[in-house]
Amino acid sequence: MATIFDILNTLNNNNNNNNFENCKRQCPINKSNKTIIDKLPPMDVTMTNDKLIIETELAGISKDHIEIDIKDSILTIQGEKKKNLNKQQQQLVIEKSTSSSTLDSKEDEPSIEEFEDDIKPKSKSDNTTVSTTTTATTKENKEDENKTKSTDKKFISERSFGNFKRYLDLTKILYQLDLNSINTQFENGLLTITINKKLHYSNTIKININ
């Protein structure tokens, strides 16, 4: 019969003290989605007389960005820790998205000038006007970026962001667990997963002969 020590031993062997290098080894690049795992959140696993408790630290992460599933006896906790933007950065993002959507809508609408352009050949002066306008727009965008860079001065940058993923192999004790009783709670950056144990369980299945 597997014990909680078997799980912890497997957990420690797989994660190797949560080193970042081992994170890349244990959580390789997903070939289909090209996702790189940047973080390996710390985890505590506790087995009581009636339940299995899994606690994972996910500080600074919204619950909407966390995914939990069990597949082939493997519990997977994954998601993304996104960087928060300040008010100035948020305003720039909104302005850029608004300006791009406005330009797209204008391009979709036919104008009288477009019909005239189809009839009349374009002159060199028209081409010069278009290129001048494009150059001016590019300069304005660069000036906005330079303003943002000049106002943001970071003295210390120790926080990490990006995708995270954590595995827990439940193969040795899965027969003891009632998967229909899984309960999750996310509070103050701590994700707690509780799985009740079955009242009656056995790792041996008796087969009758007909």
UniProtKB/Swiss-Prot annotation:
Composition bias type Low complexity, residue spans: 126-138
CDD domains from the UniProt entry: ACD_sHsps-like
UniProt keywords, alphabetically: Stress response
InterPro entries from the UniProt entry: A-crystallin/Hsp20_dom (IPR002068), HSP20-like_chaperone (IPR008978), HspG1-11-like (IPR051779)
Record's keyword annotation contains Zinc: no
Region (Disordered): 93-151
Domain sHSP span(s) in chain numbering: 34-210
Basic and acidic residues: compositionally biased ranges: 139-151
PANTHER family assigned to the protein according to its UniProt record, in alphabetical order: HEAT SHOCK PROTEIN DDB_G0288861-RELATED
Family affiliation: Belongs to the small heat shock protein (HSP20) family.
Protein name from the UniProt record: Small heat shock protein hspG6
